[in-house]
Structures are given as structure tokens and as C-alpha cells.
Amino acid sequence: MALWIYVVPPLAGLVIGYFTNDIAIKMLFRPYRAYRIFGWRIPFTPGLIPQNQPRLAKQIAKTIMGSLLTPEELHNLARKLLRTERMQAGIRWLLGVALDRLQNPEQQQQTAQVLARILADLFNESLPRLVKVLARQETFLEGPINQLFDQVLLELRLNAEQARQLSEWILKQALPPKVLRQNLVDFLTDRNIEALDEEFRERATGSYWLVANLFGLKNALLRLRTYCLEEPEGAEAILEDLLKDINAPRRLTEILQNLSLQNLPVSAVRQLRRALRDGIQDYLRSQGPEVIKGLGESIDWEKVASLVLGRLRNSKALIASIDQISADLALILERYLERDLESLMMQVIPVLNLDQVIADKVNATSPAELEQAIQQIVRQELQAIVNLGGLLGFLVGCVQVLFLLR
């Protein structure tokens, strides 16, 4: 009997079984495009997969989203990605990048401009509105004002040097002889002179009563006023000598040095504190927003921002606190995500539109690239199936030999 009966069927089965997968894959993809003869499309062109690639892409996306990337799997994946250690490392990296940015003069200038705009908007827009809203409350700044009064104004007392300087300023700038003379003239009106004369006549006793009723004060006060008007320099010289004779600087210094709110009665102090608080609150209600806005417009915010960034750049405390800050922020995010991660994922999944992304990616891949990818998977991951196909083909060939020998 011829040798080919024993050899050809097993070898043919082996070859067919081994290369069937490659042939089947090529038949699914090829040809890549349609061929036409006289405008008539040849059947089975293009291949099955290129012809139905859009529908296949949607089916692949549906399968992946329905079986692999389910909301539960995405939720678990997000939990793994957003573990505290990873979030802390990410926040630490961001803070490090921000600090490195401050070391670059050009980038620091850009950051300063951004920070300046933020500070200006906060001070010129947000803060006035906040003050306007808070000022409507009856207790607005009540605590700070009371604390300021109790700890600063109530304890305020001038030392000897401060009292001396203030007394000199009062006598030389606020109340010099010229001002005293003018105030005296303004005070000695006809009406005031009449009132003083009558009061003196009514209250004088003893020898003063005789002087008051015989001579009175009216003529003396009229002459004093006339002298101050007609001889201003002489009147000022007299007032200056009078201040020296009574040692006004020393006396005023002693008065100022001994001046303290603690010497007032408790009721007077409380009333003064209440009046101060009400005055500040009323002023802030009426003029506070405009004053704050005007103050903000007069500030060079870019310079302020540069100073702040300079302090932050050289702050050892900030650099040493980066780990602690990142850990605290990570814990805050973790508590927030534990509560709202599921709802966030339900909102994020439609926004991501993963099924459409997968379908678009499949549609954007050429049939040749798809074929190459599947062939690579078969060779690397499914080689056992290829070998099994060859083995089955060989066994089928052996069975055929048995049938031929019968």
C-alpha cells in the first residue's frame, strides 16, 4: 500500500488545525475595503468586522460597561485610587510645586499678580458687603470693642515724658495765647457778661457781696473784652505771662499723667464704654463699607502680595508643616469622600461617558490594527489553543488513515 495513505492525512490535519485560527481571523478582517466590479460590490468585501465595525464598537462598549466597568467596580477603583496615603502624597506634591514656583522670580511675579487681584477683590468687594450685613446685628463687634476698652483704654496712662510732650503740644499748638485770647473774646458776649454779672450778684456773700452790688463784674468784663480786641498783642503777652506765673506746663503735665479712666466711677466707665461701642457701631453701619473700600483702593496690593509670598518662601515653619498640612487635608478629603463618594461617582460616570469613549476608540482604530492586536493576543496568550488545534487536526488525520485501511 502507498506510503502517502499513512503520512498525508495526519500531516494535512496537523497543518489545517494549526493554521485554522490565523485563517479564521484573516477571513474576519480581510479584505479591509469593499471591491466593486462595474459598480457592483463583490460579496464578503470588506470583511465581516470592517463592515460592521460601528455596531461592533457599540457592542464592545456595552459589554465592558455592563460586565467589567460597572458602577460598583468604578466605585471600588476610586476607593483604591483615593486612599489616604495617595491623597496625602498628591497634596504634598502640589504644595512642593507651589513652593518651588515661589523660588522662581518670574513665576513669583505672576503668582503675586494673581494673589494681588484676589486680595483686592476680597478687600474692595467681599469685605464691605460682609461688614454691611454683619453691621445690622446689635451685637456686631461688641466683644472686641469691650475688650479693647477694658484692656487698652481703661489701662491707658501716660508716663512722665508722654505727659510733658502732650502738655507742650497743647500749650504751643492747640491753646497758645493767641487762641486763648480769641476764645476769651468769643466767650465774653453781651449775653454771657450779663449772665455772669447776675450770677455773681446772687451768689456773692460777705465783703464780696458789697463789691458785687456796688461795682459788679459787667464793667470789668467789658473792659477786658475791649482790651483783648484793641490790644491783641498786649493781651496775648499778659496771657503768656499768666501761664508762666501759674506754671501751666507743669500743672498740665501732672493732670495728664494722673488722668485715667480708672479714676472715674464704675457707672461712668460703663456709660463711656457703651457710648464708645454705640458710636463705633453706628459709624461702621453708615460709613464702614465706603471707608473699607476706599482704604482698599489706596493699598498697593501687588506689593502686599509680594511681601506675603516672600514671607512664605522663607518661612521655615511653613516648610516644616507641609507634611502635617497634607495629612490634615487628606483626612478631610477622606471623610468627605466616605460620605459622598458614591453619589459623586453616580454623577461622574455620565459625565465621563465611558461607553462612548470606548466606542469612539474602537471606531478610530483601523481594521489592520485590530487584526494585528488580536493576532498578538492569540500568539501570546492563546498559543495553547493553536497547539490544540494542530493536535486535533493530527488526530483527525489519523482517524482518516484508519478508515482508509479498512
From Swiss-Prot:
It is a multi-pass membrane protein. It is found in: Cell inner membrane. The chain crosses the membrane at residues 1-21, 385-405. Pfam families: DUF445. It comes from the Bacteria. Keywords: Cell inner membrane, Cell membrane, Membrane, Transmembrane, Transmembrane helix. This is UPF0754 membrane protein CYA_0973. The lineage of its organism: Bacteria, Bacillati, Cyanobacteriota, Cyanophyceae, Synechococcales.
